[in-house]
UniProtKB/Swiss-Prot annotation:
<dbReference type="GO" id="GO:0005794">
    <property type="term" value="C:Golgi apparatus"/>
</dbReference>
<feature type="region of interest" description="Disordered">
    <location>
        <begin position="334"/>
        <end position="384"/>
    </location>
</feature>
<dbReference type="GO" id="GO:0030674">
    <property type="term" value="F:protein-macromolecule adaptor activity"/>
</dbReference>
<dbReference type="GO" id="GO:0060155">
    <property type="term" value="P:platelet dense granule organization"/>
</dbReference>
<feature type="transmembrane region" description="Helical">
    <location>
        <begin position="155"/>
        <end position="175"/>
    </location>
</feature>
<feature type="transmembrane region" description="Helical">
    <location>
        <begin position="224"/>
        <end position="244"/>
    </location>
</feature>
<dbReference type="GO" id="GO:0005460">
    <property type="term" value="F:UDP-glucose transmembrane transporter activity"/>
</dbReference>
<feature type="transmembrane region" description="Helical">
    <location>
        <begin position="9"/>
        <end position="29"/>
    </location>
</feature>
<feature type="transmembrane region" description="Helical">
    <location>
        <begin position="38"/>
        <end position="58"/>
    </location>
</feature>
<feature type="transmembrane region" description="Helical">
    <location>
        <begin position="257"/>
        <end position="277"/>
    </location>
</feature>
<feature type="transmembrane region" description="Helical">
    <location>
        <begin position="64"/>
        <end position="84"/>
    </location>
</feature>
<keyword id="KW-0813">Transport</keyword>
<comment type="subunit">
    <text>Could interact with ATG14, BECN1 and PIK3C3 that form the PI3KC3-C1/AIC/autophagy initiation complex; enhancing the formation of the AIC and promoting autophagy.</text>
</comment>
<dbReference type="GO" id="GO:0030672">
    <property type="term" value="C:synaptic vesicle membrane"/>
</dbReference>
<feature type="transmembrane region" description="Helical">
    <location>
        <begin position="187"/>
        <end position="207"/>
    </location>
</feature>
<comment type="similarity">
    <text>Belongs to the TPT transporter family. SLC35D subfamily.</text>
</comment>
<keyword id="KW-0770">Synapse</keyword>
Length: 416
């Protein structure tokens, strides 16, 4: 029970941290782009990845973190995650440039639906529960309603926004798949992704001339701009780790819904701090519907977690009862069946072994030789029924179905 509580607290804490870091990074990046006209986005991405790679490598060499050294086998395990992570961050930065901050958040609110669909196709873990499905559909409808209130953005921003949602959903699902297929944790995943993506991002930053023209940017003379730039780099590293950790502990859909919950504050700050969008009635209605979907999702996930914990408690209950049974006490009482052959047969049985049978019954019912009473017999039968039910439940829960060769089984062997 204590481990279950710790797991829930850890999952909630990581989800909250992911929402805080993600929302802060979106606001600061939009502030850099809108207020200071900072357009060197590839440089931001390159410095974020290289900072994470150098920091984790230094901590690994000092022995402060348990991360295996980088190698080809390790890189091969996270190759798809590294590619999608790099592509997702690039598309996110480009969509922030072409869209207003509230409209960018509206696009991101479609992430749970896309993540759920890709997860069903890739992970093949079955359809989601009706509560989760209803929450995802309501959230997506709210995003579409809010998007109808703002169609003044850059067309390239809308294209990159759609692509960012698709790639981000695939990235989260692939993280969840990697967590099930490999033995490595989220810190190892971030280390491999950062080391693998840094050389490619360095080449891209020079190919886009961001690393060349960034030195002549006049905003470096403003200390506030420099502080915001450094904060974006550090918060970006923290957000990448919390994204991986939240997906490892919870799920891809839960991580995407964290973005939906934190977007309420992001939209509010975006409307107050930036004047590139006006809060229309459609936009406000969409945000309200979106928030309702988020609340329904939280309630549905809470009910699923509660039901799962009840199943685990029911499965663990017979083990505790078996441990309480002593060595000289049997789990149930054997009762003697009544005779079916009449009085003569019964008397013959008594003449042959009446005292012996009475002594056996006394030994079975009580180790001290006290005769059994009707109350103890009923209590023993109830306990035996309960134990039998729990044993059947454990067998059903732990059954693994195996493929059988029906041709060999049904083959008729010739008689000798």
């Amino acid at each position: 029970m204590r481990q279950l509580c710790r797991g829930r607290v850890l999952g909630i804490s990581v989800a909250i941290a992911h929402g805080v870091f993600s929302g802060s990074l979106n606001i600061l990046l939009k502030f850099l782009i809108s207020r200071y006209q900072f357009s060197f986005l590839t440089l931001v991405q390159c410095l974020t990845s290289s900072t994470a790679a150098l920091s984790l490598e230094l901590l690994r060499r000092l022995g402060l973190i348990a991360v295996p050294p980088f190698g080809l086998s390790l890189a091969r395990s996270f190759a798809g995650v590294a590619v999608l992570s790099t592509l997702q961050s690039s598309l996110t930065l480009w969509s922030l440039r072409g869209l207003s901050l509230p409209m960018y958040v509206v696009f991101k609110r479609c992430l749970p639906l896309v993540t759920m669909l890709i997860g069903v196709l890739v992970l093949k873990n079955g359809a989601p529960s009706p509560g989760v499905l209803a929450a995802v559909l309501i959230t997506t409808c709210g995003a579409a309603l809010a998007g109808a209130g703002d169609l003044t953005g850059d067309p390239i921003g809308y294209v990159t926004g759609v692509l960012a949602v698709l790639v981000h959903a695939a990235y989260l699902v692939l993280i969840q798949k990697a967590s099930a297929d490999t033995e490595h944790g989220p810190l190892t995943a971030q280390y491999v992704i950062a080391v693998s993506a840094t050389p490619l991002l360095v080449i891209c930053s020079f190919a886009s001339t961001d690393s060349i023209h960034a030195w002549t940017f006049p905003g470096w003379k403003d200390p506030a701009m420099v502080c915001i730039f450094v904060a974006c780099i550090l918060i970006g590293c923290a957000m990448n780790f919390t994204t991986l950790h939240c997906t490892y502990i919870n799920s891809a859909v839960t991580t995407s819904f964290v973005g939906v919950v934190k977007s309420i504050a992001t939209i509010t700050v975006g409307m107050v701090a930036f004047s590139d969008v006006e809060p229309t009635s459609l936009f406000i209605a969409g945000v309200v519907v979106n928030t309702l979907g988020s609340i329904i999702y939280c309630v549905a996930k809470f009910m699923e977690t509660r039901k799962q914990s009840n199943y685990e408690d029911l499965e663990a209950q017979p083990r505790g009862e078996e441990a309480q049974l002593s060595g000289d006490q049997l789990p149930f009482v054997m009762e003697e069946l009544p005779g079916e052959g009449g009085n003569g047969r019964s008397e013959g049985g008594e003449a042959a072994g009446g005292p012996a049978q009475e002594s056996r019954q006394e030994v079975r019912g009580s180790p001290r030789g006290v005769p059994l009473v009707a109350g103890s017999s009923e209590e023993g039968s109830r306990r035996s029924l309960k134990d039998a039910y729990l044993e059947v439940w454990r067998l059903v829960r732990g059954t693994r179905y195996m493929k059988k060769d029906y041709l060999i089984e049904n083959e008729e062997l010739p008689s000798p």
